[in-house]
């Protein structure tokens, strides 16, 4: 399927009201670069297109929805090396939180340690959404049975003036407080995050149904 054919399919699935709603959620996105395709339709189309080399290679894409489709396609690739290669190719063109968070390297779920060298590179990157993606991978794959104290240590060292990096850092620590409370609580008690991220972490943890009322009460004292 050519890029023009894919674009025609996307416009056939257009929902203008949804486009207008979605545009309000992504500051800085030019409405002219948004088509307005709902997520379930993008998922279906991603399965139909598959790992189409032509579409994936034609970067940058013109439309936000094409980037979303690209993220879904990469997420569905089962070969680990191919998936990683395509993600690395795509990351420099990711320019918003929605596309960044949409992409998941699910084929590494059983062996996420293979991603660690790449996660470290992403976190050390100067590109906002590479950093966000790296932290997101740590949150997705390394807060359960693959958890190690070195991972929150990595995230705690991030210092950025970028809202979408700091928000992901807060999201990571709030999720970690739900899953690895004892291990990550010292980061909050010792104020090892910058003040904004500390406050946002506590806010998100307090809003979470996965954090106990007892823990929430204590976290309120640490703002």
Question: Where are these predicted regions, by residue range?
Answer:
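Alpha-helical scaffold domains
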Residues: 1-223
């Amino acid at each position: 399927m050519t890029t023009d054919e894919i674009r025609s399919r996307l416009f056939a699935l257009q929902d203008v009201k949804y486009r207008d709603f979605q545009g309000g959620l992504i500051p800085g996105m030019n409405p002219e670069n948004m088509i307005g395709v709902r997520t379930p339709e993008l998922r279906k189309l991603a399965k139909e297109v598959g790992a189409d080399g032509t579409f994936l290679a034609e970067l940058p894409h013109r439309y936000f929805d094409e980037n979303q489709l690209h993220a879904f396609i990469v997420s569905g690739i089962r070969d680990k090396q191919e998936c990683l290669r395509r993600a690395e190719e795509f990351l420099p063109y990711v320019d918003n939180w929605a596309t960044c968070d949409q992409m998941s390297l699910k084929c590494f779920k059983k062996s996420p340690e293979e991603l660690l060298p790449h996660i470290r590179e992403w976190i050390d990157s100067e590109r906002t959404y590479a950093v966000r993606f790296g932290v997101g991978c740590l949150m997705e794959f390394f807060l359960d049975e693959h958890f190690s104290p070195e991972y929150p240590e990595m995230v705690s060292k991030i210092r950025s003036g970028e809202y979408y990096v700091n928000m992901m850092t807060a999201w990571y620590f709030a999720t970690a407080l739900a899953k690895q409370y004892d291990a990550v609580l010292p980061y909050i008690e010792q104020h090892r995050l910058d003040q904004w991220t500390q406050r946002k972490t506590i806010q998100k943890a307090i809003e979470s149904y996965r954090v106990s009322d007892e823990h929430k009460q204590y976290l309120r004292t640490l703002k």
